[in-house]
Amino acid sequence: MISINEVQSIANYCKLRFNEQELNHMVKQLSSIVEMMNKLEKIDCTSVPPMRHFEENNRMRKDQVEQNITVDQLLSNVPQSSATIAKNTKYFVVPKIIE
């Protein structure tokens, strides 16, 4: 069982705040998840063949720079109120959202 202090500690790391009702709900949910994980941990999987070979390399495409859209095409979507600034700086101007 996970304690309220553990949930508060995790919430502090994540910069989250919970009221008492939410905190109790999180304790129940996280305890349930840990309980399920403990059940899964007890399952014997030694006879189950792996579904993926870990020796395989990732088959990813090579990174290649491609010009799909021009800066002018992008900036054509800028609202008129910030168009001059955006065209001079080549950046989108957005409202401040973090204090």
Swiss-Prot record:
Family classification: Belongs to the GatC family.
Q: Which key words tag this protein in UniProt?
A: ATP-binding, Ligase, Nucleotide-binding, Protein biosynthesis
What reaction does this catalyse?
A: L-glutamyl-tRNA(Gln) + L-glutamine + ATP + H2O = L-glutaminyl-tRNA(Gln) + L-glutamate + ADP + phosphate + H(+); L-aspartyl-tRNA(Asn) + L-glutamine + ATP + H2O = L-asparaginyl-tRNA(Asn) + L-glutamate + ADP + phosphate + 2 H(+)
| Lineage, opening ranks | Bacteria, Pseudomonadati, Pseudomonadota, Alphaproteobacteria, Rickettsiales
GO molecular function terms here? asparaginyl-tRNA synthase (glutamine-hydrolyzing) activity; ATP binding; glutaminyl-tRNA synthase (glutamine-hydrolyzing) activity
The protein's job, in short, is:
Allows the formation of correctly charged Asn-tRNA(Asn) or Gln-tRNA(Gln) through the transamidation of misacylated Asp-tRNA(Asn) or Glu-tRNA(Gln) in organisms which lack either or both of asparaginyl-tRNA or glutaminyl-tRNA synthetases. The reaction takes place in the presence of glutamine and ATP through an activated phospho-Asp-tRNA(Asn) or phospho-Glu-tRNA(Gln).
The record's listing under InterPro entries reads: Asp/Glu-ADT_sf_sub_c, GatC
Q: What is this protein called?
A: Aspartyl/glutamyl-tRNA(Asn/Gln) amidotransferase subunit C
Q: How does it assemble?
A: Heterotrimer of A, B and C subunits.
According to its UniProt entry, one GO biological process term is: regulation of translational fidelity
- Does this entry carry the keyword Nucleotide-binding? yes
- What EC numbers are recorded for this enzyme? 6.3.5.-
